[in-house]
Amino acid sequence: MDSRRMSRPRQIKFEEGWSNIQKGITKLIRILEGEPEPTFYFSECFKLYTIIYDMCVQRSDYSQQLYEKYRKVIEDYTIQTVLPSLREKHDEDMLRELVKRWNNHKIMVKWLSKFFVYIDRHLVRRSKIPIPSLDEVGLTCFLDLVYCEMQSTAKEVVIALIHKEREGEQIDRALVKNVLDIYVENGMGTLEKYEEDFESFMLQDTASYYSRKASRWTEEDSCPDYMIKVEECLKMERERVTHYLHSITEPKLVEKIQNELLVMVTKNRLENEHSGFSALLRDDKKNDLSRIYRLYLPIPKRLGRVADLFKKHITEEGNALIKQADDKTTNQLLIELHNKFIVYVIECFQNHTLFHKVRVLFMCVYLFQQYYIE
């Protein structure tokens, strides 16, 4: 009896156990803050784990209190240290601090979860009422305390940096990528935070930016020069996606640019008397025609308008040829004109159905008509 009584593990009072645990937590925080502190040894980690384990399996089960303490440790550190460090910084310095604090937070949660891992097994998994895991508690603390306060300011700084890059300035793309990853990771497995708190505002700003560009460029540039700028803008925006935006953003971003730089100015650009679509056909500007086709290909309704302009042009040329040529040469000239348009359809418009139909229509209206007249 006496030997059994002696073999029972000593009951750890909560204050005593927590005091020892707190020493390990203090060391972890000092390491995160960059203060001189040796790294954790396995023996230290195992000691902390053992204390917490014993406090859960003994007669006085402190698992619920430890679970609550785990949350409070993270909340206190965040409120007392993390938030003040963020509030005192601005612009890119604030973004760098935010990235640093997010990375530190993940490290803190990772280490604390190792120390408190038995809480997950003993309390969280056995609870009749679902309660968050230690990882979920840790991430929620950052979401509620840091993300909710800082995301709006961070969004504005990132959008300002994107604007600078669009104007030709170099920016820290890696920093922007790391900041946007915070939006993604705080979505808890979804892209809701990224889409609602950043992407929607960035797309709105993009539309405004390119609307202003379109207004200026349509006044300053010929149609070919304008289209070169549009092509370059689309290329640069797609590069932005590869460097720091989430891949889900690309189709939305491209659509915004297409709408502002192509859809909204179709008539102004393509029907310009001096440098529009008809003028490019007249001057045999195949590269410029190919560019227009490539740019409007993803916009079916506007590509149809381009095909209509092609039809209008070849109709006018066909009518003019019939009026000017004599009966002996008309048929040959029409064949030559038709062959010329075949080159455009194949080389510039990739034999697209819309343009192919225009060529067939030309054959029906002019060549067959001329054949029957003869």
Curated annotation (Swiss-Prot):
Molecular functions (GO terms): ubiquitin protein ligase binding
Gene3D superfamilies: Cullin Repeats (1.20.1310.10)
InterPro entries: Cullin, Cullin_N, Cullin_repeat-like_dom_sf
Alphabetical GO biological process terms: ubiquitin-dependent protein catabolic process
Pfam families for this protein: Cullin
Family recorded in the similarity comment: Belongs to the cullin family.
Name of this protein: Putative cullin-like protein 2
